[in-house]
């Protein structure tokens, strides 16, 4: 029974350490991204103008095929 308890404790401890490691890596990634975004915003003196507005092109009309099923073109 002591061996099962020992294995269970080791498993839970390993899972906890894995979770802690993953969460710290995610936190570091977010911190780096935020720092990069803040530095990028500091370098920009004024926002760039929005892209020009494009009008929507009309859809292309494709006539239905004149060939019948089972017959050639």
Swiss-Prot record:
Chain intervals with Polar residues compositional bias: 64-73
An annotated Gene Ontology molecular function: receptor serine/threonine kinase binding
GO biological process per UniProt: defense response; defense response to bacterium; response to bacterium; response to cold; response to ethylene; response to jasmonic acid; response to salicylic acid; response to salt stress
Motif (SCOOP motif): 59-73
Family statement: Belongs to the serine rich endogenous peptide (SCOOP) phytocytokine family.
Function: Brassicaceae-specific phytocytokine (plant endogenous peptide released into the apoplast) perceived by MIK2 in a BAK1/SERK3 and SERK4 coreceptors-dependent manner, that modulates various physiological and antimicrobial processes including growth prevention and reactive oxygen species (ROS) response regulation. Inhibits root growth and regulates root meristems. Prevents general growth and development. Exhibits antibacterial effects against Pseudomonas syringae pv. tomato DC3000, Ralstonia solanacearum, Bacillus subtilis and Agrobacterium tumefaciens, thus being an antimicrobial peptide (AMP).
Protein name, as recorded: Serine rich endogenous peptide 14
């Amino acid at each position: 029974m002591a061996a099962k308890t020992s294995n269970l404790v080791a498993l839970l401890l390993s899972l906890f350490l894995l979770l802690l490691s993953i969460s710290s890596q995610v936190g570091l990634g977010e911190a780096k991204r935020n720092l990069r975004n803040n530095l990028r915003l500091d370098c920009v003196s004024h926002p760039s103008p929005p892209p020009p507005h494009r009008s929507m092109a009309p859809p292309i009309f494709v006539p239905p095929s004149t060939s019948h099923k089972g017959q050639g073109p």
